[in-house]
Regions:
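Conserved Class I SAM-dependent methyltransferase catalytic core
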Residues: 1-37
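S-adenosyl-L-methionine-dependent DNA methyltransferase catalytic core
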Residues: 5, 31-275
């Protein structure tokens, strides 16, 4: 729907997945990014500056240790883990998670998640100093997405969270602890914003007439992303509040009215072919 609307408006659009760690952020946060030009200008997604191992002229991914280096946070503000969670976290080393909990107390610690969601690595997760963090969430003590400090039995503090997201130390967040975690967790990593801004600034400063109109064209920066989307079946498993029908039988009828589970291929081109 997004792509159809942008094409109707005659925008030239490029899109693709960007990992914040590839642009200097200390977190592995992948997001689908769209850039659009009403004038059909030659937009490009920025090229990564960092890589997991640092090769091909790219720097290695930044680690949590690097992100928090020199942080002055003598009285950190953070959400409190429950006494039970603190007791369990005593068994989890830096970089570990629920799999490090002794088998004798693992099921009790996980509760119902032992049967349903126990495979998620976010349960009782203690961060590693020597790698980027996973994508920050709005609640670092949620059972399935914990962000526990590598050495202390607490989640990352507000200021540590902000450092990982790229905010300067003097940036002010309003509200209580929960509100501030939410503001930071919902933000776009500053490294990604900066990379996109630099790409757009370069485009504007080198603006020149194009021999080919690109208005109304939708281009994807990654051909494999198009293949993955087209191979994915249409599903009825939307969140309950978003479902238009109730019950499996009615859902199947609704799907059949739309042509079944087969998804219509994306009407997009690969970026190099649009240039």
């Amino acid at each position: 729907l997004i792509l159809d609307e942008l094409k109707t408006l005659d925008y030239y659009v490029v899109f693709g997945v960007m990992n914040a760690a590839d642009f200097g952020s200390a977190q592995r946060r992948t997001r689908l990014i769209f850039l659009g030009s009403r004038d059909g200008e030659d937009l490009r997604l920025p090229e990564p500056t960092h890589g997991k191992v640092g090769s091909d002229g790219r720097k290695p991914w930044r680690t949590l240790r690097q992100a928090l280096d020199g942080l002055d946070d003598p009285e950190p503000a953070f959400a409190a883990l429950s006494p039970a969670a603190i007791k369990v976290m005593g068994h989890v080393p830096p970089g570990g998670n629920w799999r490090d909990i002794p088998s004798g107390i693992q099921r009790q610690a996980l509760g119902k998640a032992a049967d349903s969601w126990g495979g998620r690595s976010g349960f009782y997760r203690r961060l590693s100093w020597d790698s980027p963090t996973p994508a920050l969430t709005t609640n670092p003590i949620s059972r399935a997405t914990m962000f526990v400090h590598p050495e202390e039995d607490r989640p990352l503090s507000i200021r540590e969270y902000a450092r990982v997201q790229g905010f300067p130390d003097d940036w002010i967040f309003d509200g209580g602890v929960r509100d501030r975690y939410m503001q930071i967790g919902n933000a776009v990593p500053l490294a990604v914003s900066e990379a996109i801004g630099a790409e757009l600034r370069q485009l504007i400063s080198h603006r020149k007439a194009s021999s080919r109109k690109r208005k109304g064209i939708i281009a994807c920066a990654d051909a494999t992303l198009i293949e993955r989307f087209n191979a994915r079946p249409r599903t009825v498993l939307n969140p309950q509040r978003m479902r238009e029908v109730e019950g499996l039988a009615e859902a199947r009828k609704w799907m059949a009215s739309l042509g079944g589970s087969t998804r219509e291929p994306l009407d997009v081109t690969v970026l190099d072919e649009a240039a």
